[in-house]
Amino acid sequence: PAGAADALGELSDEGSPAYAAAARFTRANVAQKAGDTKRAVAMLGAIAGDSDVPQSYRDLATLRRTGIEFDTLKPDAIIARLKPLTDPASPWFASAAEMTAIAHLRKGERSEAGRIYADIAARDDTAPTLKQRSLQMAGMLGVDAVNDSSKEAAKSAEPTG
């Protein structure tokens, strides 16, 4: 393990931007697994703030950091931090939007949370488990998130007379 840590350190410092970022993520993961959450959060924050790192890695670092810190952050801080990732064009939209919806729930903003869950559920690229969870959450919050084609498919599957 000591040799691996040294190799990761070298990659972090001297590798191409993508390899260096991957090594830095691995080091943050190792810190988190070892129970050093503070160090993991700091490492992920450094990745997120490093303009030499490809944007997709920076966004992932923001998402991971927010996930680790989620229970200790104020809802408004979560919403602000994840705002760029909740753009529908973002590849991180569904994950960031789910955390944002939970933050709105923590603020007592049920209708906004329901709208966000409906947006997550409506996307074709949302993972099936997240889509199902979002449909359920939207429904519990009073938002009909079942799209018309899903309603028609369910209706046509009902037995007739």
Regions found by a protein language model. Name each.
Residues 1-21:
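Short extracytoplasmic
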Residues 19-24, 28-161:
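Soluble extracytoplasmic domains of inner/organellar membrane proteins
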